[in-house]
């Protein structure tokens, strides 16, 4: 991990994944100084995180799993970062919530860099237009994310992601 952090040369943040962990384990992690957590299911997060966020104001919560449109309002209210913006319908819904609420959580666009049909995410060829559309709706696009194919070198996909981020002037 240290070698990768040094290689990246930027601020690197480790996100503790708390899915399927009991409340006691999460609280122990918080008391140990971990303050950035990821959950992949809105419903599980709703059962776990409201009291933690109320009692520990330095905690930051990321949604790292797919976001169904019927859970968007709940996710919008609970999560500080939504890392899985992956389609125009969801972008439109989040834009409406942004207008309604007067704020927008930090958003990462999920890019399907491997162009795998079984995975969600914006295809690389569609990304530039998708970013412009999101920005025109006043969505706060703070980053890109991908899940590289299992049988390919992850560094190639992260390199591609970085080029797309630079090309679109996304600073995170």
Residue ranges, per PLM feature:
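Conserved alpha/beta-domain cores
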Residues: 1-172
């Amino acid at each position: 991990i240290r070698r990768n952090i040094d290689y990246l040369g930027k601020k690197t943040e480790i996100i503790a994944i708390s899915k399927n962990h009991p409340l006691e384990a999460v609280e122990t992690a918080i008391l140990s100084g971990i303050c950035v957590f990821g959950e992949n299911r809105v419903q599980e997060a709703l059962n776990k995180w409201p009291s933690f966020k109320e009692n520990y104001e330095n905690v930051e919560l990321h949604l790292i799993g797919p976001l169904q449109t019927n859970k968007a309002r709940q996710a919008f209210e609970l999560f500080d970062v939504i890392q899985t913006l992956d389609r125009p319908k969801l972008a439109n819904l989040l834009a409406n919530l942004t207008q309604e609420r007067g704020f927008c959580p930090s958003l990462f666009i999920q890019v399907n860099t491997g162009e795998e049909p079984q995975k969600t995410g914006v295809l690389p060829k569609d990304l530039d237009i998708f970013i412009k559309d999101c920005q025109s709706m006043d969505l706060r696009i703070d980053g890109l994310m991908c899940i590289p194919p299992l049988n390919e070198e992850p560094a190639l996909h992260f390199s591609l992601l970085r080029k797309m981020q630079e090309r679109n002037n996304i600073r995170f």
